[in-house]
Amino acid sequence: MPEDSTAIDYVMEKASGPHFSGLRLDGLLSSPSKSSVSSPSHFRLSNSSFSATDDPAAPHQPFVIGVTGGTASGKTTVCDMIIQQLHDHRIVLVNQDSFYRGLTSEELEHVQEYNFDHPDAFDTEQLLHCVDILKSGQPYQIPIYDFKTHQRKVDAFRQVNACDVIILEGILVFHDSRVRDLMNMKIFVDTDADVRLARRIRRDTVERGRDVDSVLEQYAKFVKPAFDDFVLPSKKYADVIIPRGGDNHVAVDLIVQHIHTKLGQHDLCKIYPNVFVIETTFQIRGMHTLIREKDISKHDFVFYSDRLIRLVVEHGLGHLPFTEKQVVTPTGSVYSGVDFCKKLCGVSVIRSGESMENALRACCKGIKIGKILIHRDGDNGMQLIYEKLPSDISERHVLLLDPVLGTGNSANQAIELLIQKGVPEAHIIFLNLISAPEGIHCVCKRFPKLKIVTSEIDQCLNEEFRVIPGLGEFGDRYFGTDE
């Protein structure tokens, strides 16, 4: 790069192929190249390819959806509708019925008395193993259950491969907490009991070789009690309840829109709904490229860091509560808008966090800003040295400022202090430029109600607890004390 040009325009001009600052980096964009610059094992930035992920070669965690409801409620129809609308993604449907246990000879003799709607009828351990294997990106051979012989087929199975979305469907997929914990979205299909019974009679007589009397007897003896004892109570775990099942096209459309949004997010955003990564554009990735370069001048480092910080602050402010407000425009017309949150303050973690104060002041005129100093004693030890916070901080929403989220230990101590001062956990928004996955896990598991807003999630921490690929000691580089 020429010495007299470190502007982001230079980065844009030198990268081959078309670029648009508003374009999302949801996939690989390929174009001819003459040379490339890469960072081994982390992410690739070259003229030939550009990826929105931290590591294009790394497997991504699939999005797991659980779909349950009463027997014949329309679960399969809902799953089919979701699959059809997500046709551009790799989807695997795992039916809980495939994991019925094969009946013993004694159970077969009294098959009419066997309760197929009880949790013990399923091999939950194998279902868990199946999902774990699929989430790791490996193929799995799903057993095929024969409802006429009540045994698994020995010489047949269904091979499923790595995928983007896993749909777990079955009447009791919400019953076991271990299975629930694997799900990113839980859907309960709610259909009238009479409709479900009519569907059950038709299905079991046509597809499973049963007669009507045996279906009705089984329904009254096992199915209805199992629904009341196991299925209906699991409704409380659902994130989404769909009335009328597959007939509710509006509900399914909204679910698919949400899934599309989640599939475009970082894996950690799927796990923690309180983690928000600002939308990635070539401008943002270009600025990250500049501030991460070790030989950039201090002036340019500060300039592009300030630009990124401003974007993070603006995004963080968007998560504050707003009230509706109407104003009269110069034309005499009424404009319906919103009013900003009044009770707000910033808290910077000294000293790197102080680099974010100017952007916050530029966005919020006259905002109060407190300070917290935490001393690092060794790798994990933390000691609070100094704090000066607004006296009425318990009545305010707090923007916690720290440009780098590494281990999460100092962040946890700062958040704990704010909570001790009376700040509700849900009123804290933690703003940073880059975050390590370890730090996000550490903070979100302990404080699930606060929000984290960042511009990029990096790959990992190294043995020295530095963020990789990272950008070095941010405070030293920003304030010019790294020499």
Curated annotation (Swiss-Prot):
InterPro entries: P-loop_NTPase, PRibTrfase_dom, PRK/URK, PRTase-like, Uridine_kinase-like. Keywords: Allosteric enzyme, Chloroplast, Glycosyltransferase, GTP-binding, Kinase, Multifunctional enzyme, Nucleotide-binding, Plastid, Transferase, Transit peptide. It comes from the Eukaryota. The keyword Transit peptide applies. Residues 1-47 form a transit peptide. GTP binds at K298, R307, C341, K342, K343, L344, R396. One of its GO terms (biological process) is regulation of cellulose biosynthetic process. Residues 274-483 are annotated as: Uracil phosphoribosyltransferase. 5-phospho-alpha-D-ribose 1-diphosphate binds at R351, R376, D402, T407, G408, N409, S410, E473. Disruption phenotype: No visible phenotype. No decrease in uracil phosphoribosyltransferase activity. Loss of sensitivity to 5'-fluorouracil and 5'-fluorouridine. Pathway: Pyrimidine metabolism; CTP biosynthesis via salvage pathway; CTP from cytidine: step 1/3; Pyrimidine metabolism; UMP biosynthesis via salvage pathway; UMP from uridine: step 1/1. Residues 59-264 are annotated as: Uridine kinase. Transmembrane segments: none annotated. Its EC number is 2.7.1.48. It catalyses: cytidine + ATP = CMP + ADP + H(+); uridine + ATP = UMP + ADP + H(+). It is found in: Plastid, Chloroplast. GO terms for molecular function: ATP binding; cytidine kinase activity; glycosyltransferase activity; GTP binding; uridine kinase activity. Uracil binds at G472, E473, F474. GO terms for cellular component: chloroplast. SUPFAM superfamilies: P-loop containing nucleoside triphosphate hydrolases, PRTase-like. In the N-terminal section; belongs to the uridine kinase family. Involved in the pyrimidine salvage pathway. Phosphorylates uridine to uridine monophosphate (UMP). Phosphorylates cytidine to cytidine monophosphate (CMP). Does not possess uracil phosphoribosyltransferase (UPRTase) activity that catalyzes the conversion of uracil and 5-phospho-alpha-D-ribose 1-diphosphate (PRPP) to UMP and diphosphate. This is Uridine/cytidine kinase UKL1, chloroplastic. The gene is UKL2.
